[in-house]
Curated annotation (Swiss-Prot):
Metal-binding recorded as keyword: no
Reported consequences of knocking out the gene: No visible change in biofilm formation (in BHI-S medium), TcdA toxin production (in TY medium) or growth in sporulation medium (SM); increased sporulation in SM but not 70:30 medium. In SM medium, sporulation initiates earlier than in wild-type cells. Higher levels of spo0A transcript and of Spo0A accumulate. Increased transcription of 165 genes (most are in the spo0A regulon), decreased expression of 21 genes. 5-fold increase in expression of the sinRR' operon (CD630_22150-CD630_22140). No change in pathogenicity in Syrian golden hamsters.
Organism field: Clostridioides difficile (strain 630)
One of the record's GO molecular function terms: RNA endonuclease activity
Designated name of the protein: Probable endoribonuclease YicC
NCBIfam families for this protein: YicC/YloC family endoribonuclease (TIGR00255)
Cofactor(s) of this protein: a divalent metal cation
Domain of life: Bacteria
Keywords for the protein's UniProt record, in alphabetical order: Endonuclease, Hydrolase, Nuclease, Sporulation
Lineage: Bacteria, Bacillati, Bacillota, Clostridia, Peptostreptococcales
Classification via Pfam families: YicC-like_C (PF08340), YicC-like_N (PF03755)
Job of this protein: Negatively modulates sporulation, probably in response to nutrient conditions. Effects expression of sporulation regulator spo0A in an indirect manner, possibly via repression of the sinRR' operon.
């Protein structure tokens, strides 16, 4: 079944210590374009997230946002450099004695010096974090796929309906085309009769030859056969479980080409009007497939 490139999905994971929120939005795009925003603290998981997204989205622009919070636990360690602190204290004592400073040396005096107190982020277990984030991302992607599939189903049904309209139009064109040559013969015969004083001298062989040449030039049988084949392929394609947008686009291009040829070969007003209708329906399908994966 056709899959829309437009959709949204949201997933969460939460326990006593960790919270993940994942939001994923997709829109139409000619190729696959995956954009991931996640906190620096878990940036090492980006490639795994990207690979997971690729399993669900074959084409389109993907914007995936990840929020990560630690609950009930500190995410940093505070340490101090004992050796460096000892050196600072010794030098402060030396300064105090040398200049007879009466103030005492306090903890605050020492702590203000660079690199005495160090803030270090705690290292989290990568496998543990991924097992939790994977659940949230997959939950969001499953919901995204459901929404895209539902929208794709509606698009496929609309295209199938338009395929039926196209089939009706091309069958009408085929019906009118069968009488085009005979109409040409009658008009040619009438025109010659008007120009000649004696219609009985019309060269029937030459007339038949001219009609045959016209019939060959104006024949749209091959175009109609190919057009019908493309309609069948299009209807079969839109209900396949695959990335089908580009194939449908190709079929529409081919159908437009056949339609243009039919229009250029025929001067029949009925066929001309039907060609306009066919091109209108093809344009509507072309607009629809811009949003199919």
């Amino acid at each position: 079944m056709a899959i829309s490139m437009t959709g949204f999905g949201r997933g969460e994971y939460k326990d006593d210590n960790y919270y993940f929120l994942v939001e994923c939005k997709t829109i139409n795009h000619k190729y696959s374009d995956i954009n991931i925003r996640l906190p620096r603290k878990i940036s090492f998981l980006e490639d795994k997230v990207r690979n997971l997204v690729k399993n669900y989205v074959k084409r389109g622009r993907v914007d995936l946002y990840i929020k990560f919070d630690l609950l009930g636990k500190e995410d940093v360690n505070l340490n101090f450099d004992e050796g460096l602190a000892s050196q600072y204290i010794d030098i402060l004592k030396e300064i105090k004695n040398k200049f007879d400073i009466i103030d005492d040396i306090s903890v605050m005096n020492v702590a203000k010096f660079p690199d005495i107190v160090k803030i270090e982020e705690k290292e989290e277990d990568e496998d543990l974090l991924w097992s939790m984030l994977n659940q949230a991302v997959e939950d969001a992607l499953i919901k995204l796929r459901e929404m895209r599939s539902e929208e794709g189903k509606k698009l496929a049904e609309d295209i199938a309906m338009r395929c039926d309209l196209l089939k009706n139009h091309i069958e009408e064109i085929e019906k009118y085309s069968s009488s085009v040559v005979e109409d040409y013969r009658e008009k040619l015969n009438l025109r010659i009769s008007e120009l000649l004083d004696d219609p009985s001298i019309i060269d029937e062989n030459r007339l038949a030859q001219e009609v045959a040449i016209y019939a060959d030039k104006s024949s749209i049988t091959e175009e109609i056969v190919r057009f019908k084949s493309h309609i069948g392929q299009l209807k079969n394609t839109i209900f396949k479980d695959d990335s089908i947008g580009r194939k449908i686009d190709f079929l529409i291009q081919e159908m437009n080409r056949e339609t243009n040829t039919i229009g250029s070969k025929s001067s029949d007003i009925n066929i001309t009007n039907l060609v306009v209708e066919v091109k209108s329906e093809l344009e509507k399908i072309r607009e629809q497939i811009q949003n199919i994966e």
